[in-house]
Amino acid sequence: MAKKKSEDHSGADANDSDYNEEPNFDDPPNFVDNISDEDLLGDMLAQRPSEADGVESVVVVDNMPKVEPSRLDKLKSVINKLFSHCGEIVNVVYPVDEEGNTKGYAFMEYKTASQAEDAVKKLNNHRLDKNYTFAVNLFTDFQKYENIPEKWEPPTVQPFKVQSDLYNFINDPDTYDQYCVAAETAPNCVQVGFWQNTLPEPNELETRERFTDTFVKWSPLGTYVVTFHKPGVAIWGGSSFQKIQKFPHPGTQFVEFSPCENYLVTYGPTPTGQKIIIWDIRTGGEKRSFVGDGMSVLSMFRWSHDDKYVARMGESSIHIYETPSFYLLDLKSIKIPGIRGFSWSPTDNVIAYWVEEQNQIPARVTLMKIPKKREIRNKNLFHVADCKLHWQKSGDYLCVKVDRYSKLKKDKKELDVKFLGMFYNFEIFHMREKEIPVDSIEIRELILAFAWEPIGNKFSIIHGEQNSANVSFYEVNKGVKPSLVKRLEKKSCTHLFWSPRGQFIVMANLTMGTFEFVDTTNDYIISASPDHFRASEVEWDPTGRYVVTGVSSWKVKEDTGFNMYTLQGRIIKRTILKNFVQFLWRPRPPTLLSEEKQKEIKKNLKKYYPTFEQKDRLRLTRASKELLEKRAQLRETFMEYRNKRIAEWKDQKSRRQMLRGHVDTDNLETDEVDEEVVEFLVKEEITLLE
């Protein structure tokens, strides 16, 4: 509220009075307001109270079975059980004919209108069985459709919007990769810059101020980038990163794309848990929504590799939904008592899940083929505390890390369970071999990390004490037990990052910011050991040629930025960026070349070397020429600025002499200066001697 000008400040200048006087909000004379209330206050008018007629909480359920009086009680039981999940049902009416048979629809009244809306959203188009699919509508919808005008008016033709090419980023003749860099410029305001990793210096493609509130995320194939905002999320794409689609879901904290980029899942909080919405990316429409209990494993959806199925884990069950209808597979969940975790194969419609020990029944790892729900492999496990499922990227192997115990200690109420004498097993499933054989490796030390080679048959583990751990590399071959091929001892690392193309690996300590680059085909020699103090992330580019380490402001506030290295660990670029948040390489879609064509190119790769080397020389020559021209331009600009300032300095000579007693201090020699020494008392101290 503006403060009135007081008498004590009557002598203030005009600038101060501008701030103290109350502003005038009156419209100027002859002002015409051409903005409607709907345009100006649309969000508020949508919430204004309206006259109610008492039927807002009533829904109409159509396409129900028509049953005789003897079967009516059973139908009521089924319907009540299904619809009571949406809220408290106050009254239900089943209209009947003269013989007492139901007419195939019912009126259902909920306690509140919001519960009725929730029932329509969740149960409309719900399949009761193969013959009956519910049509659920609000009773007020009938009144709305009664007011449809009799004269039909054709819809207004919308102008065609030319959409940018979403795949232009893979048309670059030199196949340079792209990346984005995010930095926070103000609270809830993040600037995002998009770059192309050209040589010798990266090329800036686009920079967006206030592009997102928190962070960004690429889609799996690199087609879209998603941004987070208070009303929801938006996806962007094309050559200039224009908005493609927006999805209204207030407070969205996390999103997940389906592998083929057909669907988007948004996770947002609610007062009682979490709301999860699955969207169609191309249309922007909502396919289905769920209510979860928070960011727990029971809330997370997992997609099959081909987008045909999406699954989530429930209490003693797995719910698998088919796309695009998002109905349950075979209209029912898969009952699996004691299930603790599951994961899809990255290349096949196979689900791996594990079940905990129950009543002297051993734990079990199972592979199930979808959609037939046929179990193709089982493995029983004893004394199991926990399991982790690790698929190799190519889908050739599945490793189950089993945390086992020697002794189990429970308190009297069996609420607190302690596992003693822990040791670990790796169960390796050979997915491409007949009957899926399983190999087992036992490790008696603490396992700190596990990582598969994405393309290849090796995996690596960190085991032992954290400050002096060992890194072991195992090789998996057909018909032979996995063998230890190399052990690097006394390594201070916490994470393992394989190159997307295999062969090279970075052993990282994300606590201390130390890194070691290893070539697994060259006797596991450490090619470089750079440091990046406080680094909290490591990102390989899609081709496996470059590695980026970053210090994010989410972790620290000083010395934030990122470093770029070659795959051998040679530093290429150091960038210090205030409030740096994220560095993300843009993913690439899989190649369209057949395996035969790829093998042919690899076989004849040497004949392409001269062409590549010539292009590199021309590029460096061009870059050197551009660099020399840039330096010459900078020197010319500097000399022009210098000459201008010298001319100003000479023009001010008479003024300087006048201010300095008509002494030309510009040409004053050292021997013309009179030096005078002045002494004065600073302080006086008196010390008494005994």
Curated annotation (Swiss-Prot):
Residues 15-25 have a biased composition (Acidic residues). Residues 613-646 form a coiled coil. Residues 1-33 are annotated as: Disordered. The keyword NAD does not apply. The keyword Protein biosynthesis applies. Residues 1-11 have a biased composition (Basic and acidic residues). One of its GO terms (molecular function) is RNA binding. WD repeats lie at residues 207-246, 292-331, 334-369, 442-484, 530-575. GO terms for cellular component: eukaryotic 43S preinitiation complex; eukaryotic 48S preinitiation complex; eukaryotic translation initiation factor 3 complex. Residues 57-141 form the RRM domain. It is found in: Cytoplasm. GO terms for biological process: follicle cell of egg chamber development; formation of cytoplasmic translation initiation complex; regulation of translational initiation. Gene3D superfamilies: 3.30.70.330, YVTN repeat-like/Quinoprotein amine dehydrogenase (2.130.10.10). InterPro entries: EIF3B, eIF3B_RRM, Nucleotide-bd_a/b_plait_sf, RBD_domain_sf, RRM_dom, TIF_beta_prop-like, WD40/YVTN_repeat-like_dom_sf. Pfam families: eIF2A (PF08662), RRM_1 (PF00076). RNA-binding component of the eukaryotic translation initiation factor 3 (eIF-3) complex, which is involved in protein synthesis of a specialized repertoire of mRNAs and, together with other initiation factors, stimulates binding of mRNA and methionyl-tRNAi to the 40S ribosome. The eIF-3 complex specifically targets and initiates translation of a subset of mRNAs involved in cell proliferation. Belongs to the eIF-3 subunit B family. Component of the eukaryotic translation initiation factor 3 (eIF-3) complex. The eIF-3 complex interacts with pix. Interacts with mxt. HAMAP family: eIF3b. This is Eukaryotic translation initiation factor 3 subunit B. It comes from Drosophila grimshawi (Hawaiian fruit fly). The gene is eIF3b.
